[in-house]
From Swiss-Prot:
Gene from which the chain derives: ureB
One GO CC term on file: urease complex
GO MF terms held by the record: urease activity
EC number: 3.5.1.5
Taxonomic placement: Bacteria, Pseudomonadati, Pseudomonadota, Gammaproteobacteria, Pseudomonadales
Protein name: Urease subunit beta
Annotated organism of origin: Pseudomonas putida (strain GB-1)
Keyword Cytoplasm attributed: yes
SUPFAM superfamilies: Urease, beta-subunit
GO annotation, biological process: urea catabolic process
Key word Hydrolase present: yes
Enzyme class, first EC level, given as a word: hydrolase
Length: 105
């Protein structure tokens, strides 16, 4: 082994395996494009994006880290979302949660 070398297992790594997912149909009713990053709490995205928000509480886009989805004005699309893991606490974003996700409806 070379110092600093990384040895990985053979095969593909499945992202977000075993996590709860939901899909949401989202329409951009604004006059500007809206881009949402991979780890943004989808419940709190720009208000120009119109969709049923309640089921998205505690979910983010199910896409690779560091990537984003762009919604053009007038565009509607269905996206796949994946549940946050770990402590399941959300802070920041638009400040709509600021704490634990459990026990919220």
């Amino acid at each position: 082994m070379i110092p600093g070398e990384v040895q990985v297992a053979a095969g593909d790594i499945e992202l977000n395996s075993g996590r709860e997912t939901v899909s949401a149909t989202v329409a951009n009713h604004g006059d500007r494009p809206v881009q949402v990053g991979s780890h943004y709490h989808f419940f709190e995205v720009n208000e120009a994006l119109v969709f049923d928000r309640a089921p998205t509480l505690g979910f983010r886009l199910d896409i690779p880290a560091g990537t984003a989805v762009r919604f053009e004005p007038g565009q509607a699309r269905t996206v796949q979302l994946v549940a946050y893991a770990g402590k399941r606490e959300v802070y920041g974003f638009q400040g709509k949660v600021m704490g634990a996700l459990e026990g919220r409806a």
